Every structure is written in C-alpha cells, then in structure tokens.
A protein has these predicted regions:
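Catalytic active-site module of serine/aspartate enzymes centered on a nucleophile-bearing elbow/loop
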Residues: 251-291
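Acidic catalytic loop of the alpha/beta-hydrolase fold
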Residues: 232-236
Length: 291
C-alpha cells in the first residue's frame, strides 16, 4: 500500500508526523514502540488491502519525524492525549488502534482517558502487540538513561552501531532476519537529531507506582481486543500477554511461534493472518494458539 506524509499540530504547534494510505471504510491507526517510528511497520503494511482499510502510521511525539520539544512531557498519558486529539481533529471513524510495545500502552491509556472523561471515542477495536501494559523492571540500559549524569554520557559515548546491535539482538528471535538493510535502517533512525533527549525524557516519565492497580482499570475497557505476542519475547515476557488477556474482558490472545518482541517485523505474514478476521469483524472467540 502506498502512503503519503501528513502533519497534525498538537497543543498550539507541536508537529506530529504521520503517513497515511488506502481508501477503505475501516481506519487503522498504528502506534509504534519505544525509540521507534512509523518505519517499524514497513514489513506488514503491504499485506493490508487498500480498498478495505485506511492506514495511518503515527510518529509519536519525540520520535520519527515528529517534533522533539525539550519540555519533558513524554509520559504515556501525554502520548495518549495526543492520539485522542489526533483522532478527534482528523474526524476519524470506525477506528482500530494498533499498538506495539509502548504504543500498546498508549492505546490502552487513550481508552481509559476517554472512559474517565466520558468522551465519545470512535475506536471500535484494539490490536495490542507485545504490549507494555504493566509495571516491570526496566532493562539495565534504560535504568541508566534515567540518571542525570550517566544517561546523557551513555548516549554520547556508546557508538550507535553497538547500541543498535544490542537492541536488535534482544528484539529478534531469528537472528538471520537482522539483514544489513534492516540494521542500517535502525542505525539511521538512532542517529536522528533529538532522539537522545526524547529517549531520556520518556524513560524518566515512567513511574511504575502509578500503574500498581492498572489491571482493575483495564477491566473497564469493553472493546474487542486482539492481543498478539511473540513466543520468545525477552523484552516483555509472554506472561504479560496472558495477564492482559485475563484483564481485558473481550480479548483473545494469539501467540506467534519462533518470534521475539516485534511480530510485525519478524513474522509479518503470521501477524497479519492473526489480524485479518478480527479486523473484518467476523468473530472474536479464541482460536489457534490463543487460549
């Protein structure tokens, strides 16, 4: 599917970049994970028929081609407010939010905010991939990023290619899929201006104590939800997906075999197959690998 760039101005001038394509009646809004961008979806987008779906690939604030203001406001709550504002201002309807990792957490928070504020929210379904839904211990590198002195130093001292190598080795289960082209795509992105600040600011906004009782809130979300998880994910373990399946009352869970943290990159065909019937609204009941 061919996509074109667009821009949305949030809160008096914060530029939010997105790419969109397709002319179908159902709108799919994709939300990437931490330190990623709209390019993370390049492997799976071609599977979506342009006559059935309209696709919007958002760059969240501070990531990709979106603005990176040094305002410290990079919490999941803030990102969720931006998503809601985007949906409202663009007058979207029949929306499915598709979130990976951090983006899944943002999708969930957007739903909870709309429920709390009793605001009409034209989201019909959720697709949550290896979702950052609960408090968990951050990887060592991210914990160090939070420190005032060591964090900025790490970003400057560690060569980008080493940082990328360590990242993709943890993200991908099948190391043969880390092609030179994919590796260089990650390197180009990590060298982007302003990303170092965004990464530090985002990590500093993570406060696990605020999410201690989040499971009880998720039970308020009645939307049909498809939870997709890589069987060998070492970033957000499979048990998190099973817990989320228990907490979301209208959810189904599909486990993608021989797959790490990024099913949409590592197993795009299998991931799309898991999504196809769900997005068409044919059924919700659990099938295949899901319980």
């Amino acid at each position: 599917m061919r996509t074109e760039s667009g821009c949305f101005n949030y809160n008096n001038g914060i530029r939010i970049h997105f790419r969109s394509g397709g002319s179908g009646p159902r709108t799919l809004v994709f939300l990437h994970g931490f330190a990623a961008s709209h390019t993370t979806w390049e492997d799976i987008v071609p599977f979506f028929p342009a006559d059935r779906f309209r696709i919007i690939l958002m760059d969240m604030k501070g990531f990709g081609l979106s603005a990176k203001p040094r305002d410290g406001a990079y919490s999941i709550e803030e990102q969720a407010r931006i998503v809601r504002s985007f949906i409202r201002e663009e007058r979207l309807s029949q929306v499915t939010l598709i979130g990976h990792s951090l983006g899944g957490g943002v999708a969930l928070r957007a739903c909870l905010q709309a429920i709390a504020e009793k605001e009409p929210f034209p989201v019909e379904r959720l697709v949550l991939m290896d979702c950052a839904a609960y408090p968990q211990r951050l990887p060592k590198f991210f914990r160090r990023l939070k420190t005032p002195i060591l964090g900025p130093l790490l970003i400057r001292v560690i060569p980008v290619k080493i940082m990328v190598q360590r990242t993709v080795e943890k993200v991908f289960y099948d190391q043969s899929l880390i092609t030179a082209e994919r590796f260089e795509r990650y390197v180009r992105y990590f060298r982007g201006r302003g990303l170092a600040y965004t990464m530090r600011a985002s990590v500093r906004c993570i406060r696990p104590e605020e999410y201690e009782h989040i499971g009880e809130q998720y039970r308020l979300i009645s939307l049909p939800a498809l939870i997709i998880w890589g069987e060998q994910d070492v970033i957000v373990k499979q048990k998190t997906g099973r817990r989320l399946h228990e907490d979301l009352p209208a959810s189904r869970l599909t486990i993608i075999e021989r797959c790490g943290h990024n099913p949409h990159e590592e197993r795009p065909a299998e991931t799309y197959a898991a999504m196809e019937d769900f997005l068409s609204g044919l059924h919700l009941e659990s099938q295949g690998n899901g319980p």
